[in-house]
């Protein structure tokens, strides 16, 4: 009977190891797919820059050429990173764990009556699939954190809502810069794997990876969430882990009509800040920082700062939980004038 239990334990251990490996494989694929999407986006941006350079090369007027060159020089750096995915290297570690465990099991069987209970204990192995990026040397030295709105605006990144991810109750307007919850009115969006099925959420079309980014949004109505998530979020799930407040790879800020609340891994942190109808969102990918600021014309107030561990490209994420909620992405490139420099304050 004891040998029967031992055999069952071995089979259970085998099943658990296989399940563990499958989960890690899916996590690795999710990270790789996120990086692939980011590289494809960067490739398209580089092709666009190539076309702009070819157009400039054909300009014969020297003054016009210099004007176009200055505009091009001030555009965002779109360096193309190389990527190393270390899944193969990690397999040797898994093989070592299994080999050592087998030897240990044989030793236990020599005196199984005394060691059986010890063998039955579960052991956890810290086996990770790591995706690492090779970053250019000029990004190794960390720059000081911005302290004025003018400095934040140096990192402006233009984002739009991705119509292929928008829930059927969300209406996109203004060239995909405004989203509104129109429940119960549905919109005739095609059924796509990337579209959210249960939670009224939408992601940005652009990925954020390796650099610093800044954008601003205007929020309308209690129950709006603004944050970041990874490409691997389950768009079809109904569980809390499928919304941007309920998992450990999403970070979000909620406005409940009275105050802001920070959310991470289904845990909330009430904040004494607000009301602010415009939020500034700052991402320092290398530094692992996500900060939210209340923005007024002449001031910025820190609402909350997350310390994050980014391992793959992230996307701006938005959850409009109630009817008539709306979020608008501010086009900072069309603001009438830049505000005077003002130091960033902290909410009391």
UniProtKB/Swiss-Prot annotation:
Residues covered by the B30.2/SPRY domain: 139-337
SMART domains linked to this entry: PRY (SM00589), SPRY (SM00449)
Protein keywords: Cytoplasm
CDD domains per record: SPRY_PRY_TRIM16
GO CC terms, sorted: cytoplasm
InterPro entries, A to Z: B30.2/SPRY, B30.2/SPRY_sf, Butyrophylin_SPRY, ConA-like_dom_sf, PRY, SCF_subunit_WD-repeat, SPRY_dom
Organism domain of life: Eukaryota
Cell compartments where the protein resides: Cytoplasm
Principal location class: cytoplasm
Family statement drawn from the similarity comment of this UniProt entry: Belongs to the TRIM/RBCC family.
Protein's recorded name: Tripartite motif-containing protein 16-like protein
Gene that encodes it: TRIM16L
